[in-house]
Amino acid sequence: MATINQLVRKPRSRKVAKSDVPALQGCPQRRGVCTRVYTTTPKKPNSALRKVCRVRLTNGYEVTSYIGGEGHNLQEHSVVLIRGGRVKDLPGVRYHTVRGTLDTAGVNDRRQGRSKYGAKRGKS
């Protein structure tokens, strides 16, 4: 426990909050261009081929972004919108692509949770 005199000489320092998504620079989303679209494998104990893309953002950052949903139409030079949100079993992937905006198509035949995948309501 510090004495009052010690606190007068050197006050307590505030903890600085570190951003989980530094490339967004405080913005909700950012636009970017895909430089590479590929699949990668998750950490143990999971097993899959996760779809990810490397994105060069408008602010100059280059980040890895996860492509959610079943199937996608992205390729190199596609313009995408990314949002924050990491993928726990993919190290280094801290962003998600937003489906249904810019060059990213929504997920086909999606019935539930459609807003997260840019899917239209469709005929019932």
From Swiss-Prot:
PROSITE patterns, alphabetically? Answer: RIBOSOMAL_S12 (PS00055)
CDD domains (UniProt xref):
Ribosomal_S12
Top-level lineage group: Bacteria
Keywords on this record? Methylation, Ribonucleoprotein, Ribosomal protein, RNA-binding, rRNA-binding, tRNA-binding
Locations of Basic residues compositional bias? Answer: 113-124
> Which SUPFAM superfamilies does the entry link to?
Nucleic acid-binding proteins
Q: Where is this region: Disordered?
A: 1-22, 104-124
Q: Where is the signal peptide?
A: none
Q: Which GO terms describe its cellular component?
A: small ribosomal subunit
Q: What InterPro entries does UniProt report for this protein, alphabetically?
A: NA-bd_OB-fold (IPR012340), Ribosomal_uS12 (IPR006032), Ribosomal_uS12_bac (IPR005679)
Gene3D superfamilies assigned to the protein according to its UniProt record, in alphabetical order: Nucleic acid-binding proteins
An annotated GO BP: translation
Q: Which GO terms fall under molecular function for this chain's record?
A: rRNA binding; structural constituent of ribosome; tRNA binding
Modified-residue entries (3-methylthioaspartic acid), positions: 89
Q: Which family does it belong to?
A: Belongs to the universal ribosomal protein uS12 family.
Relate the assembly described in the record.
Part of the 30S ribosomal subunit. Contacts proteins S8 and S17. May interact with IF1 in the 30S initiation complex.
Alphabetized HAMAP family for the sequence: Ribosomal_uS12_B
Role played: With S4 and S5 plays an important role in translational accuracy.
Q: What is this protein called?
A: Small ribosomal subunit protein uS12
Gene symbol? Answer: rpsL
